[in-house]
Amino acid sequence: MEKLAIFGGEKIAKDDEMKFNWPRITNDTEKVVIEQLYKTISIYDNSGIFGEFEKKFADYHNKKYALLSNSGTSAIFSMFEAIDLRNDDEVLCPVYTFHATVSPMMYFGAKPIFCDSDNEGNISFDSVKNKYTENTKAIIVTHMWGVPIKDIQKIADFCKEKHIYLLEDCSHAHGAEIYGKKVGTFGDIAAWSLQGQKTVTGGEGGIILTDDKNLFNRALLQGHYNKRPKSEIDKSDDLYKYYLTGMGLKLRAHPLAIAIANEQFGHLNDFLKTRNEYAMKITKALLKYPFLKTPTISSYTINSWYAYGLQYIEEKAYGVAKEKFVDALHAEGLIEVDIPGSTGLLNALLLFTEPNVILGRLYPNKLPMQKGFSNAEQYVEQLIKIPIWTFPDESNIVDKYIAGFKKVCDYILENKGL
């Protein structure tokens, strides 16, 4: 049995050999930025790079309308505006997600109603059905870590049955599919982040897609004014009268960011092909360890692998704590192994229990802390994650991560502990 690095043995690799570097800036990336610099660095409508990217992104998803914004959070904010969310409206949402899936709704005085997770960390359809009331106006979902929600079609059908909106946060899931249908096409409106670590990135940015012109018009007026609303909202629409001012905000993207995103987007299918090959390779290598539960890979899904989430089951690892397991992997040079901190359960966050302190104009009183999320609690308690590398020339890094995991896991099995 090879001595573990945490006990003074030789590491699998040096730390600087095991980083996840993203995005990869190429000569093509530099070229499109420089070209855009000499065209314009501010766009007031959907001309130029804005129109080009919006059309490509909409066509890729077979959607009619696309709208760029300055961040994924702003894009989600615009979805809530699009559905005319109001004070005391209830929105069903995942208790386990990044907070910005839910936090923008607090600017409308709405009430988030948290739903439990399924065994993949995505929102549970059973929980959705149980939490629905006559006050429910919408459901917002997240395809966590780039894994499509297994019951997304059931959720979409439920929304149609109840005549409520379905909003999709696809910020982790660019290009992901389930049953031959891309995420972001199941609901009434969907949002993607183009932030620096996202699969399609411009550094910062966001985009929404919809087939509903009324939803598009409201979102457009929220974050844009003058030229773009004037040219894209029909004069017969009551909203047209507000084109000059919009709703008072400016959430426009930056052309340089969208130039980068447009160049990156051209490689998305290649990115996903390589990521899925690496994810399958990692999964096959780790399946034999009873204390590791790998994410489900099925023939009817294409995951985008924003991250690869593993569940570490301490009681099956002879009581070795998750933190100690991760420390042993870090010691081998596997520096990207992570226990997520910024993404977790939302129900106890102060914004959702004591909004009265900072948003007293909308929430005069505290909100009761919602409880009863056993699946999500277990998922978060057991979760560790690694990135999935994206390029064929990174296969050696993937192999070293597999070797590091196997080294530590084999030690635990043979020695019944660590």
Can you annotate each of these PLM segments?
Residues 173-179, 186-307:
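Active-site region of PLP-dependent enzymes
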Residues 296-299, 305-317, 336-355, 382-395:
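Conserved PLP-binding active-site segment of the aspartate aminotransferase-like
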Residues 1-82, 86, 155, 160, ...:
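Conserved PLP-binding active-site segment in aminotransferase class I/II-type PLP enzymes
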Residues 120-202, 207-214:
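Active-site phosphate-binding strand-loop segment of PLP-dependent enzymes
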Residues 227-238, 286, 325-384, 415-418:
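Conserved PLP cofactor-binding pocket of PLP-dependent enzymes
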Residues 33-34, 57, 75, 91, ...:
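Generic structural signal for small/hydrophobic residues in well-ordered secondary structure
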Residues 157-165, 207-226, 319-320, 324-334:
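Basic phosphate/pyrophosphate-binding loop/patch that engages nucleotide-derived ligands
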Residues 77-133, 138-140, 329:
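Conserved PLP-anchoring active-site segment centered on the Schiff-base-forming lysine
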